[in-house]
Amino acid sequence: RTVIENAEEVVYEEKKMEEMEVTFLMDRFGYMRTIDKSAYERNKEAANAENKYVFNCMNTDKICIFTDNGKMHSIKVADIPLVRFRDKGTPADNLSNYDSAQERMLYVAPLASVKENTLLFVTAASMCKLVSGAEFDVAKRTIVSTKLAEEDSLIFVGSADEMEQVVFQSEGGYFLRFQKQDISAMKKTSIGVRGMKLAEGDKLDHAYLLESRQEYTITYHDKPYVLNRIKLSKRDSKGTKPRI
């Protein structure tokens, strides 16, 4: 005999994750973890000393990883284990498409701050540009962060909003300091403009962002070298060699 049942479909509602602020930690080997904010406050000194990247972010946000081969990988904060302070982190390779054997991290930040900022991109061939961080607010786990010429690679990606000047340093020991506003704002799909005229065979190995009111000192040939003292020039000039 036929039984007619008034069976309603059972709907399982996924429990919404409670939104909260956590502290993201990543060491120089690319092992990442999130910890409770109060655990960070208690272990602040050790956390800052042992980790390359330390910042607070929402557990509903994403972490953006910009690498030297012109890629940006993103990881949901919720996918990064929330652990006790002394627990080990998880390699970025296991949580994203990032491949530590093939690429190097240049800049790591939460998407919430990336999209509010302007980023400076600098390549070894001295191409540079400013890009609105909103261009990196995408759903894909990996995107091309910039267009690179063949054989070129990124040497610097960083938040540029607070800064007024840039310094480029080449492998051959040349330095060029100029105003950030000399760099064009462009789309992420563009190659950029030339920052410093390089001699044949020379390439950039460092770029720095400076605030004009603050002194920035690096170690060059084992001696302190103040970047603010470099003659202020124009973009697309030749650099100068320090007399050290």
Model-predicted segments: where are they?
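C-terminal interaction appendages of subunits in large macromolecular complexes
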Residues: 1-244
